[in-house]
């Protein structure tokens, strides 16, 4: 017997909050799934909620059972695991989960579908998929052994029995393949080849997106017969990045090679324009300047405000200083084989030229060999955007 929700009132409270956040009622099929799957059964005794200041507040069910249950049925993300002081697993915000499921078309499937979830975590998302598609149609994959065990225990306690696999979500798993839907619960900066290989023609690949510059957005791809996939980004969700089992397969770290040559110049591009919270601009920079990351230094040791830019794939770096007086020119220092600030400036200029496109005007084509080509739709044309300066945008009808 499937376990009921804590109370009907708790489920209604969560549904009301989700509807309010999404600004529209969720489709009936998704509403039934949310009412059916008891979120509290998928949470550990100790959960952490963001405190709005970069930290986390602990809620322990043993000490505060009523508050813990209230948190379980609040439309918010909850950290469920820390590793070396950093959050490494969470229960996603329910409204984001339902928005993703709606994007995948699961609110009104026209035929039976098979789905692979990449990242079981608590098991809550897998349970929603089971409620929508049936247990036998769902495969869920988890790399972390402890999370896999916990997710399996949670799913069984709630009465759901999808196919559970312990392993790397970036490699091929044949159970139920090819899939009509591949749904990731973590963010990626490239589409693993196995996801395209395991997608049925016309199948959907839905994944949160990240770049070294901007961890934001959800990519919805459609797979094609020739092994390629194409789709558009959507302006919601910021998820933890994919974890890999071997360091050699992880995201490359900056090289240690010293590049003493330091080029200094003056720039009219404000660092706040590309790293000050404009998600449309930051998304474009992140998508088209691969490997570039940033951090702010406001200690005053070098300048009142300094933007530090680094290349996560090599030794290049740059700094942009605000002297506290002039907001129309900034001192730039660059070193390494890439002139990072020049690349970022070119990307920002292109974004301006294209009419400051929103996140949802951006898209991605992944060809059968795995090449990733980002593009922007603006002024009725599709523009293939280039990462390096000095290369003009190519337009396609």
Regions from the language model: what does each represent?
Residues 2-116, 125, 132, 151, ...:
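Class I SAM-dependent transferase core
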Residues 25, 30-31, 85-97, 210, ...:
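Hydrophobic alpha-helical segments that drive targeting, anchoring, or assembly
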Residues 40, 48, 168-170, 211, ...:
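Short, solvent-exposed coil/turn elements at secondary-structure transition points
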Residues 59, 231-237, 315-324:
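Short amphipathic beta-strand/extended segments with alternating polar/hydrophobic composition
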Residues 88-206, 211-213:
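Conserved nucleotide-cofactor-binding alpha/beta core module
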Residues 183, 188-304, 383-397:
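Class I SAM-binding transferase module
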Residues 306, 311:
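C-terminal catalytic lobe of FAD-dependent flavoproteins
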Residues 312-397:
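C-terminal target-recognition/interaction regions appended to catalytic cores
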């Amino acid at each position: 017997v499937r376990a009921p929700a804590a109370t009907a009132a708790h489920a209604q409270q969560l549904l009301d909050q989700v509807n309010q956040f999404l600004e529209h009622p969720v489709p009936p099929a998704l509403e039934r799934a949310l009412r059916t799957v008891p979120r509290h059964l998928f949470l550990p005794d100790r959960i952490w909620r963001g405190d709005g200041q970069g930290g986390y507040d602990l809620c322990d069910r043993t000490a505060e059972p009523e508050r813990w249950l209230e948190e379980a049925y609040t439309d918010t993300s909850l950290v469920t695991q820390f590793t070396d002081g950093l959050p490494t697993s969470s229960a996603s915000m329910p409204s984001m989960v339902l928005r993703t499921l709606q994007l995948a078309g699961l609110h009104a499937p026209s035929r039976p579908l098979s789905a692979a979830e990449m990242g079981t975590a608590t098991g809550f998302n897998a349970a929603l998929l089971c409620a929508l598609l049936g247990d036998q149609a769902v495969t869920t994959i988890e790399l972390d052994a402890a999370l896999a065990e916990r997710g399996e225990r949670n799913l069984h306690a709630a009465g759901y029995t999808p196919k559970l696999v312990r392993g790397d979500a970036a490699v091929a798993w044949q159970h139920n393949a090819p899939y009509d839907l591949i749904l990731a619960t973590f963010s990626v900066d490239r589409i693993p080849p196995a996801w395209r290989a395991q997608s049925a023609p016309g199948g959907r690949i839905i994944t949160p997106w990240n770049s070294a510059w901007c961890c934001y957005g959800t990519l919805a791809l459609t797979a094609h017969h020739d092994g390629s996939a194409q789709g558009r980004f959507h302006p919601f969700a910021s998820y933890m990045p994919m974890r890999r089992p071997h360091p050699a397969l992880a995201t490359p770290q900056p090289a240690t090679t010293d590049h003493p040559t330091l080029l200094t110049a003056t720039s009219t591009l404000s660092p706040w324009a590309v790293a000050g919270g404009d998600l449309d601009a930051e998304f474009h920079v992140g998508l088209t300047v691969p490997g570039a990351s940033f951090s702010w230094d406001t200690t005053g040791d070098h300048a009142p405000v300094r933007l530090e830019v680094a290349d996560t794939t090599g030794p290049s770096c740059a700094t942009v200083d605000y002297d506290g007086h002039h907001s129309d020119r900034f001192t730039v220092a660059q070193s390494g084989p890439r002139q990072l600030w020049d690349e970022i400036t070119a990307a920002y200029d292109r974004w301006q030229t294209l009419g400051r496109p929103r996140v949802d005007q951006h898209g991605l084509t992944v060809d059968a060999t795995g090449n990733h080509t980002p593009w922007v739709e603006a002024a009725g044309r599709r523009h293939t955007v280039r990462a390096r300066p000095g290369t003009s945008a190519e337009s396609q009808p």
